[in-house]
Swiss-Prot record:
Protein name: Fez family zinc finger protein 1
Phenotypic effect of disruption: Null mutants were born alive but most of them died within one day. The olfactory bulbs were smaller than those of their wild-type at 18.5 dpc and at postnatal day 1. At 14.5 dpc and 18 dpc no abnormalities in the morphology of the telencephalon or diencephalon were detected. There seems to be a redundant role for FEZF1 and FEZF2 in diencephalon development.
Gene3D superfamilies named in the record: Classic Zinc Finger (3.30.160.60)
Residue ranges with Polar residues bias: 427-437
SMART domains: ZnF_C2H2 (SM00355)
Family, per entry: Belongs to the krueppel C2H2-type zinc-finger protein family.
């Protein structure tokens, strides 16, 4: 047998209990539960505020809480001072300790009424009169950074604690569900109808006031209610407790600005990238050029949409008239024509439009200002595309040619009107619902049959004496 196995067997026999007649010598254990528990360090806790020191009467915490065991309450807030004069947050660092000034509690009048928390939270914490009302001027404090704090150092706080966070001014004595210790963790003044935060261990439950009334113990809630409150707490914490970092950073002098303004037109953007995309509107730069037709665009996305025109693909087809389009957005706009839907209405004349672009161009006609002027003949126009078509008259550029007669036009609209009026009528062509010409002859209207003519009557000579020649011949 190996020596290592022999040593292990010897140790096992030495520590094993006596069985039957076999006697073994017991050795003292190298560890003990008492020594392990004695070496367990106590959790570090924040010092108790001086206005709470001595306010808790001596006694058994378990008896005051009516609990069989003391469960530490974990509150995810740390009290941090906020100096209203210098607007500088204090988190306990040495250079900023000077602005953390907790005023001393005023003298308690002998006849002042006592405020006891034993009926609310069973923590046996009592404050008297003005001390309970003015123990902490909440307007001078503001929450800067949340942190999980083991507040077992507060005497007999127990497993149940209510945190109150509101938006309006209210003294702790004016609302029955406000705890003076919890007020120390507030970030804003209290409200007469506040939201209640139920904290038990590391689980934070944020129910609404109407769903969980004040004074309800944690043990009285069902498991379904707790799960429901836990789900609701996630959104509320992210919105309201997650915690004013934007407000705090906005007040910092070193915070980066979140507003970017165009120096030319004054338009505001929330990102520098959007401002960069906007600047070509003023500079006229069109860095994105189509390789097929050479047309330039300010944005790459506009160029991508333009490339579909050259593919001659029109996958989006109208179900009513059969007309096809390159983009689905164009089809959606086209369907407004069949539905008679004109969402863009002119404020001046009441005329409606299917498209927003046509609506904007129409409004320029009411302004009376023609800011687009021709450099050659000084003719002015309301809209820029009218000036573009007008420039073709000076350079004799007519890109749209009639395939029948060869006549050129500056606009495609004029070409279609020319074909519809001249060639379709002369060739007997009609337009189908899709807009394509058809060789079928146009239907002829049925005319009523002509009225019957009256019968012809023979014409007789008028009565009178016959001529002499005719009279003699008969004789």
């Amino acid at each position: 047998m190996d020596s290592s196995c022999l040593n292990a067997t010897t140790k096992m026999l030495a520590t094993a209990p006596a069985r039957g007649n076999v006697m073994s010598t017991s050795k003292p254990l190298a560890f003990s539960i008492e020594r392990i528990m004695a070496r367990t360090p106590e959790p570090k806790a924040l010092p108790v505020p001086h206005f709470l020191q001595g306010a808790v009467p001596k006694g058994d915490p378990k008896h005051s809480l009516h609990l069989n065991s003391s469960i530490p309450c974990m509150i995810p807030f740390v009290p941090v001072a906020y100096d209203t004069n210098s607007k500088a947050g204090v988190n306990g660092s040495e250079p900023r300790k000077a602005s953390l000034e907790v005023p001393a509690p005023p003298a308690v009048a002998p006849s002042a009424p006592a405020f006891s928390c034993s009926d609310l939270l069973n923590c046996a914490l009592s404050l008297k009169g003005d001390l309970a009302r003015d123990a902490l001027p909440l307007q001078q404090y503001k929450l800067v950074r949340p942190r999980v704090v083991n507040h077992s150092s507060f005497h007999a706080m127990g497993a149940l604690c209510y945190l109150n966070r509101g938006d309006g001014p209210c003294h702790p004595a004016a609302s029955v569900n406000i705890h003076p210790v919890a007020s120390y963790f507030l970030s804003s003044p209290l409200h007469p109808q506040p939201k209640t935060y139920l904290a038990e261990r590391n689980k934070l439950v944020v129910p609404a006031v109407e769903k969980l009334p004040s004074g309800v113990a944690f043990k009285d809630l069902s498991q379904a209610q707790l799960q429901h409150y836990m789900k609701e707490s996630a959104q509320l914490l992210s919105e309201k407790i997650a915690f004013k970092t934007s407000d705090f950073s906005r007040g910092s002098p070193n915070a980066k600005p979140k507003v970017f303004t165009c120096e030319v037109c004054g338009k505001v953007f929330n990102a520098h990238y959007n401002l960069t995309r906007h600047m070509p509107v003023h500079t006229g730069a069109r860095p994105f050029v189509c390789k097929v037709c050479g047309k330039g665009f300010r944005q790459a996305s506009t160029l991508c949409r333009h490339k579909i025109i050259h593919t001659q693909e029109k996958p989006h087809k109208c179900n009513q008239c059969g007309k096809a389009f390159n983009r689905s957005s164009t089809l959606n706009t086209h369907t407004r024509i069949h539905a008679g839907y004109k969402p863009f209405v002119c404020e001046f004349c009441g005329k409606g439009f299917h498209q927003k672009g046509n609506y904007k161009n129409h409004k320029l006609t009411h302004s009376g200002e023609k800011q687009f002027k021709c450099n050659i003949c000084n003719k002015a126009f309301h809209q820029v595309y009218n000036l573009t078509f007008h420039m073709h008259t000076h350079n004799d550029k007519k890109p749209f040619t009639c395939p029948t007669c060869g006549k050129g036009f500056c606009r495609n609209f004029d070409l279609k009107k020319h074909v519809r009026k001249l060639h379709d009528s002369s060739l007997g062509l009609t337009r189908t619902p899709t807009g394509e010409p058809s060789s079928d002859p146009p239907p002829q209207l049925q005319q009523p049959p002509p009225a019957p003519l009256p019968p012809l009557q023979p014409t007789l000579p008028p009565p009178g004496p016959l001529p002499s020649g005719l009279h003699q011949g008969h004789q």
